[in-house]
Amino acid sequence: MSKQSLSYKDAGVDINAGNELVERIKPHVKRTTRSEVIGGLGGFGALCALPAKYKEPVLVSGTDGVGTKLRLAIDLKKHDTIGIDLVAMCVNDLVVQGAEPLFFLDYYATGKLDVDVAADVVKGIAEGCVQSSCALVGGETAEMPGMYREGDYDLAGFCVGVVEKSKILDGSKVQAGDALIALASSGPHSNGYSLVRKVIEVAGVNPATEQLAGKPLAEQVLAPTKIYVKSVLELIEKTDVHAIAHLTGGGFWENIPRVLPENVKAVIDETSWDWQPVFKWLQEQGNITRHEMYRTFNCGVGMVLALPQAEADKALDILRAAGENAWLIGRIEALNAGEQQVIIR
């Protein structure tokens, strides 16, 4: 009796589905190309030249995911914007150091490849790359039977950017008297989602049908993370930006001190902006303390920038002309013994 001849597909890996996905995403990937990219998809490695305008180029790299926002997106079958979140989390971390994103790669892992879902995700990744002028040069699609529950997948992103060595933003220029400007977020972005999901569970609501300020709750908690690359790079070019903090995990308390010298503090006026309805709803439904809100969520502020007070009005004009909602939210002061580096009052 002859044994059955087994194939990779019998083991749960469909190479043809993977090939179909590659064909489906090619038009989206093509939208992201930059002149520095050499070759196309399909090589063992992606090739990218450095832009000629840089005299002393320094490469800046970053990697990130979207946390358990992905769980919410999968449960609500909203796959077309989670890729924007993935790109945003990486490129926003690069631009706060003054870097222009050059290229991006993604990792998509699942138990059984659903080509339609994966194509939607990559379409979002490509859109995020377009928004940040970053080339999507490659990625890995891993179909791994037995590793994930049916319908589940995971994402990771990797980005490389470049900055002129003399223009690296490291916070060393921040000084007492600097103004603090906030850039509005689009919602919780991609942080705090384990708490978001817990609040939804405790509240006993269906985010797809629950209405908040005239919109479904699902739409507000899954709003894609704002990408600030183009507006911030323009601001850096036209003003003397001293530092930028990307408000991600750890919120205000942990991210702002990352860009401050040890001898100063950020004093923030919380009446200078309004929390979006989704943050008020989360605080109320979860009975979350003010301190915990500022530690877990961005509370409506995606980035905080420090620059000379004399340039504050000019900076606000530039940012608003670029389509950003921006406010003056505070100032840098000298740090006294025993004080925290972030004071919100």
Swiss-Prot record:
The keyword Nucleotide-binding applies. Keywords: ATP-binding, Cytoplasm, Ligase, Nucleotide-binding, Purine biosynthesis. The lineage of its organism: Bacteria, Pseudomonadati, Pseudomonadota, Gammaproteobacteria, Pasteurellales. It comes from Actinobacillus succinogenes (strain ATCC 55618 / DSM 22257 / CCUG 43843 / 130Z). This is Phosphoribosylformylglycinamidine cyclo-ligase. The keyword Ligase applies. Pathway: Purine metabolism; IMP biosynthesis via de novo pathway; 5-amino-1-(5-phospho-D-ribosyl)imidazole from N(2)-formyl-N(1)-(5-phospho-D-ribosyl)glycinamide: step 2/2. InterPro entries: PurM-like_C_dom, PurM-like_C_sf, PurM-like_N, PurM-like_N_sf, PurM_cligase. SUPFAM superfamilies: PurM C-terminal domain-like (SSF56042), PurM N-terminal domain-like (SSF55326). Pfam families: AIRS (PF00586), AIRS_C (PF02769). Its EC number is 6.3.3.1. Belongs to the AIR synthase family. GO terms for cellular component: cytosol. It is found in: Cytoplasm. It catalyses: 2-formamido-N(1)-(5-O-phospho-beta-D-ribosyl)acetamidine + ATP = 5-amino-1-(5-phospho-beta-D-ribosyl)imidazole + ADP + phosphate + H(+). GO terms for biological process: 'de novo' IMP biosynthetic process; adenine biosynthetic process. Gene3D superfamilies: PurM-like C-terminal domain, PurM-like, N-terminal domain. Disulfide bonds: none annotated. One of its GO terms (molecular function) is ATP binding.
